Amino acid sequence: MADCTTMRLASSVTIILLLLVASQALVVSGESSSSAMQSKTLNMNKLLNISEDHSPNGGRHWMQRMQPDSCSEQNVVVYQNNAEHLPSGIPTYSVEIINVCTACTVYDVHISCGEFASAELVDPSQFQRIGFNDCLVKGGGRLGPSEAVSFQYSNSFAYPLAVANVACE
């Protein structure tokens, strides 16, 4: 009789511990997915040039990037992310360069890129280093409203890429 009671007690304790571990795992995974969602939202806000409005009426507003006469480097954003490594183990990065102006075309887009190089060929008609810290998007050609250029490169480290110069139509 005592053995049966001891086994029931041990089983009950084991079940309770398993439930506690499972609930803790759910809480932890909920926090990480929540923070991942916040991070994705923040990245998307940067990508789309959305900023938080802390005015009394609250809400969000779009930063105006619509008039060609307000041409600036801010009309183009560079978004860079880790991608799958090459079979050789070399890290790969995906890059998206986007004209966020919805009413203007940009051209002659130059990106500061250090000594950009890639273990895998990047299509030079899309992105090409033309000098130290100077890379050219689409050979200087036009990037229409909301148009994007995407490519991947492979190197042991990510290059800091930033818009250096643009012209607008």
Curated annotation (Swiss-Prot):
Any Pfam family the entry gives: TPD1_C
Signal peptide: 1-25
Entry function: May play a role during anther development.
Stored InterPro entries: TPD1 (IPR040361)
Claim: Signal is one of the keywords in the record: yes
GO biological process: cell fate determination
Tissue spec. comment: Expressed in roots, and at low levels in anthers during meiosis.
Protein name (Swiss-Prot/TrEMBL): TPD1 protein homolog 1B
Keywords from the UniProt entry: Signal
